[in-house]
């Protein structure tokens, strides 16, 4: 418990420092996610995102997506989904011309490694991207961890720490495209609702143009369980 409180204390200090960062450099990354558990094997999800390059100004991106997950075993599942992803020019709110209009599908493998007081998550995703600049493939790997603070597991009335880092690759040179880091915390009110906030750093690699972006992330997560089994709900986003 002492280690958990130390981790939470350092995380809060880090997030407060980020929130005091210049608003001209800190963007906003907002997520609304809903999951529907149909039975012990199948679940569906829907998610929408809205992003800005300044703190709740210069909105340049939004996405809407949905999909389904099949639970193969306790710690192993497969996901498929599709969505619409839209990126506008910088310098205003949804400034035209639009830079990228994309329809995306993907298949994904999810694996969990639960340990004594935290759970590691591995996510492997292959994306098929139909953009206004042609068809593209992309491959993503995300390693994450969640640590409950005031309970042994993430359950109702639990504060938790969430950490992950994701790498993006393509099948064309220079192959490495992006890395995305998240450091945050959340609170699960009950088995249906959780809220999460944190800091996202996204680095986009281009041959002669390396760009890093900073975002304050806020996510509201809903879980609707048709089975009424009252099992552990692990809050997480779909992106």
Describe each model-derived feature in a short phrase.
Residues 24, 40-41, 75, 114-119, ...:
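Short loop/turn motifs that connect adjacent beta-strands in outer-membrane beta-barrel proteins
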Residues 26-28, 60-62, 101-105, 135-141, ...:
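Residues that define the transmembrane beta-barrel architecture of outer-membrane proteins
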Residues 31, 43-49, 77-83, 110, ...:
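Transmembrane beta-strands of outer-membrane beta-barrel proteins
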Residues 49-55, 83-94, 127-132, 166-172, ...:
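Sequence/structural signature of outer-membrane beta-barrel proteins
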Residues 113, 117-204:
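Outer-membrane beta-barrel transmembrane domain signature
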